[in-house]
């Protein structure tokens, strides 16, 4: 998966897809009560990027639904996966559960449109800290009595992006109601302004490939240097988050990689661990 980073304006959806992305990351900002309010990253972010682009949340989700609904004039078949980078650090932790419920309602009614046929992209809920796990718990429990529980079970995955201890990550996911390998993505990375070793990525890949692991997919963020992309692919990641998707597509065409990797399509399940 080529994961376009910081896609927070509606026009950026097509911009990143046209550059070769098949996935996008969207930053979700909340009000002080924990209700999703708009798309926004803010500073600091990445080198050579504007960090303050924003849309009202309802407008962006409406456009995202259109881009991922077959038959819609704005449908883009390339867009198979959306990572919601949930900026949950801006409100009191006591509101985490209610915030998760509110975001579940937004996805059900504004993205899925209360239908099995709209908003087909797979979703990863990405939280910045392990102690925000009640957001995931609430999101899942919203669908316990819903006729759309099948969409939760088919289309939603989970990630913690704060580079915290992976053994503890497993425990916290279980506390949130997520079983081992139940749609678990594990990210590792840092802003593109700083070089980061692949040690933690390799540890995550080892857990993913272990018979007793809890991870389905591993991704690295945020890179666009050709050498860094090659190193990440050689570490056997499943996804790369980037500001320059065309760099990833160029590397995938190189002799060393063209027979080892290909772009994921909608028919590639992001919850299944790939076995070579």
Curated annotation (Swiss-Prot):
Keywords: Cytolysis, Dermonecrotic toxin, Disulfide bond, Hemolysis, Lipid degradation, Lipid metabolism, Lyase, Magnesium, Metal-binding, Secreted, Toxin. One of its GO terms (biological process) is lipid catabolic process. The keyword Metal-binding applies. It comes from the Eukaryota. Its cofactor is Mg(2+). Signal peptide: none annotated. Disulfide bonds join 45-51, 47-193. GO terms for cellular component: extracellular region. Its EC number is 4.6.1.-. It is an enzyme of class 4 (lyase). The active site is at 5, 41 (nucleophile). One of its GO terms (molecular function) is lyase activity. Binds 1 Mg(2+) ion per subunit. InterPro entries: PLC-like_Pdiesterase_TIM-brl (IPR017946). It catalyses: an N-(acyl)-sphingosylphosphocholine = an N-(acyl)-sphingosyl-1,3-cyclic phosphate + choline; an N-(acyl)-sphingosylphosphoethanolamine = an N-(acyl)-sphingosyl-1,3-cyclic phosphate + ethanolamine; a 1-acyl-sn-glycero-3-phosphocholine = a 1-acyl-sn-glycero-2,3-cyclic phosphate + choline; a 1-acyl-sn-glycero-3-phosphoethanolamine = a 1-acyl-sn-glycero-2,3-cyclic phosphate + ethanolamine. It is found in: Secreted. The keyword Lipid metabolism applies. CDD domains: GDPD_like_SMaseD_PLD. Mg(2+) binds at residues 25, 27, 85. Belongs to the arthropod phospholipase D family. Class II subfamily. Dermonecrotic toxins cleave the phosphodiester linkage between the phosphate and headgroup of certain phospholipids (sphingolipid and lysolipid substrates), forming an alcohol (often choline) and a cyclic phosphate. This toxin acts on sphingomyelin (SM). It may also act on ceramide phosphoethanolamine (CPE), lysophosphatidylcholine (LPC) and lysophosphatidylethanolamine (LPE), but not on lysophosphatidylserine (LPS), and lysophosphatidylglycerol (LPG). It acts by transphosphatidylation, releasing exclusively cyclic phosphate products as second products. This is Dermonecrotic toxin LlSicTox-alphaIV2iv.
């Amino acid at each position: 998966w080529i994961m376009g980073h910081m896609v927070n304006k509606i026009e950026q959806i097509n911009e990143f897809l046209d550059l070769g992305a098949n996935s996008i990351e969207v930053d979700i900002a909340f009000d002080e009560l924990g209700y999703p309010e708009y798309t926004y990253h803010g500073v600091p972010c990445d080198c050579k990027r504007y960090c303050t682009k924003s849309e009202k949340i309802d407008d962006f989700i409406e456009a995202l639904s259109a881009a991922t609904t077959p038959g819609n004039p704005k449908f883009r078949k390339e867009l198979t996966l959306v990572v919601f980078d949930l900026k949950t650090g801006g409100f009191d932790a006591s509101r985490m559960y209610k915030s998760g419920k509110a975001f579940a309602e937004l996805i059900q009614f504004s993205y899925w449109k209360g239908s099995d046929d709209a908003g087909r992209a797979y979703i990863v809920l990405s939280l910045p800290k392990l102690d925000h796990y009640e957001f995931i718990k609430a999101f899942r429990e919203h669908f316990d009595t819903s006729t759309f529980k099948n969409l939760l079970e088919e289309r939603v995955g989970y990630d913690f992006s704060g580079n915290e201890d992976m053994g503890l990550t497993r425990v916290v996911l279980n506390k949130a109601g997520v079983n081992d390998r139940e749609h678990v993505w594990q990210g590792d990375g840092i802003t593109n302004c700083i070089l980061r070793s692949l040690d933690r990525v390799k540890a995550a890949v080892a857990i993913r490939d272990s018979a007793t692991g809890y991870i389905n997919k591993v991704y690295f963020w945020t890179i666009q240097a050709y050498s860094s992309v090659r190193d990440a692919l050689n570490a056997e990641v499943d996804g790369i988050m980037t500001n320059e998707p065309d760099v990833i597509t160029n590397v995938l065409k190189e002799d060393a990689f063209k027979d080892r990797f290909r772009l994921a399509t909608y028919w590639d399940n992001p919850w299944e661990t790939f076995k070579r």
